[in-house]
């Protein structure tokens, strides 16, 4: 049994802008989660092309997770089992990410398939699942300006879209009805990231608990990440994809250093 949910994240940026903003924010967020032997290690970051013509950027990362998994898993899992591999094929505006664990092999999988569309999250079944499968998928809307969707320990005033005003674009702050207002704002673009998340965790007695925990963490990550992305708008809106590739190279070097020298930091599972 696998657990599927679709998270819809609406943003006051264009699909083209988001491509740069997402990559910038991934690099920055990685630094915030890396230290004390834990965090992100980038193994591969290179262009790819498949036989069917699909092409984009392929990345392979290892997440060293010790303090970032629940205590009940930490107690049961042997040393080294708490590292997960993330392989991503970014054929923007479509992206596919597959997360696996060498210890659990085919008993553990997180798959995130994302379509980025220039709409307000109104499309049904953008991933074109079979009607019977789609019927069982729960659609969850994430509102980046809704403080109630953010855990108090994750809240940062400087990363609050309800308070942020972009100097370069004039966008923000986002009020309670910002999504409805977007429709009438001719000068402000918008888009939705449709994130279909498949979770499989086969471990007798823990399956439901862990699958639900993972979905809860994915929603938390998507919420925090996209709040940051919008509030960092002025830092990335003028960047090109060439700028991003140079930044990713520098970030890889920094992450290797931070994992060795910095203390453990970032989100922990038991928060």
Swiss-Prot record:
It is found in: Cytoplasm; Nucleus. Changing residue 60 to Q: No significant effect on phosphatidylinositol and phosphatidylcholine transfer activity. Belongs to the PtdIns transfer protein family. PI transfer class I subfamily. GO terms for cellular component: cytoplasm; nucleus. Residues 251-271 are annotated as: Disordered. GO terms for biological process: axonogenesis; phospholipid transport. It comes from Rattus norvegicus (Rat). Catalyzes the transfer of phosphatidylinositol (PI) and phosphatidylcholine (PC) between membranes. Shows a preference for PI and PC containing shorter saturated or monosaturated acyl chains at the sn-1 and sn-2 positions. Preference order for PC is C16:1 > C16:0 > C18:1 > C18:0 > C20:4 and for PI is C16:1 > C16:0 > C18:1 > C18:0 > C20:4 > C20:3. The lineage of its organism: Eukaryota, Metazoa, Chordata, Craniata, Vertebrata. The modification N6-acetyllysine is found at residue 216. A 1,2-diacyl-sn-glycero-3-phospho-(1D-myo-inositol) binds at residues 59, 61, 86, 90, 97, 195. Keywords: Acetylation, Cytoplasm, Lipid transport, Lipid-binding, Nucleus, Transport. The keyword Cytoplasm applies. Residues 251-264 have a biased composition (Basic and acidic residues). InterPro entries: PI_transfer, PI_transfer_N, START-like_dom_sf. One of its GO terms (molecular function) is stearic acid binding. This is Phosphatidylinositol transfer protein alpha isoform. Phosphatidylinositol transfer activity is inhibited by N-ethylmaleimide. Phosphorylated by PKC in a calcium and phosphatidylserine-dependent manner. It holds the Pfam family IP_trans. Gene3D superfamilies: 3.30.530.20. Signal peptide: none annotated. Expressed in a wide range of tissues. It catalyses: a 1,2-diacyl-sn-glycero-3-phosphocholine(in) = a 1,2-diacyl-sn-glycero-3-phosphocholine(out); a 1,2-diacyl-sn-glycero-3-phospho-(1D-myo-inositol)(in) = a 1,2-diacyl-sn-glycero-3-phospho-(1D-myo-inositol)(out).
């Amino acid at each position: 049994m696998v657990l599927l949910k679709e998270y819809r994240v609406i943003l006051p940026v264009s699909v083209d802008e988001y491509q740069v903003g997402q990559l910038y924010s991934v690099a920055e967020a990685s630094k915030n989660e890396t230290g004390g032997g834990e965090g992100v290690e980038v193994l591969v970051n290179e262009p790819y092309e498949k036989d069917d013509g699909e092409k984009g950027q392929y990345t392979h990362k290892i997440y060293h997770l010790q303090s970032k998994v629940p205590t009940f898993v930490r107690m049961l899992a042997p040393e080294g089992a708490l590292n997960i591999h993330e392989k991503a094929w970014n054929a923007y505006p479509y992206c596919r990410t597959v997360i696996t664990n060498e210890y659990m092999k085919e008993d553990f999988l997180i798959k995130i398939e994302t379509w980025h569309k220039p709409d307000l999250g109104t499309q049904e079944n953008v991933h074109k699942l079979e009607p019977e499968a789609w019927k069982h998928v729960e659609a969850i809307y994430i509102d980046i300006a809704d403080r109630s969707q953010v855990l108090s320990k994750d809240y940062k005033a400087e990363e609050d879209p309800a308070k942020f005003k972009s100097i370069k674009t004039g966008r923000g702050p986002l009020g309670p009805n910002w999504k409805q207002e977007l429709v009438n704002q001719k000068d402000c673009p918008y888009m939705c990231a449709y994130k279909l998340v498949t979770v499989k965790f086969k471990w007798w007695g823990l399956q439901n608990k862990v699958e639900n925990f993972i979905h809860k963490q994915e929603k938390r990550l998507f919420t925090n990440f996209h709040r940051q992305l919008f509030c960092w708008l002025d830092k990335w809106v003028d960047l090109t994809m060439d700028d991003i590739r140079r930044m990713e190279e520098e970030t890889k070097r920094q992450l290797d250093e931070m994992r060795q020298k910095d203390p453990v930091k970032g989100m922990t599972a038991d928060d």
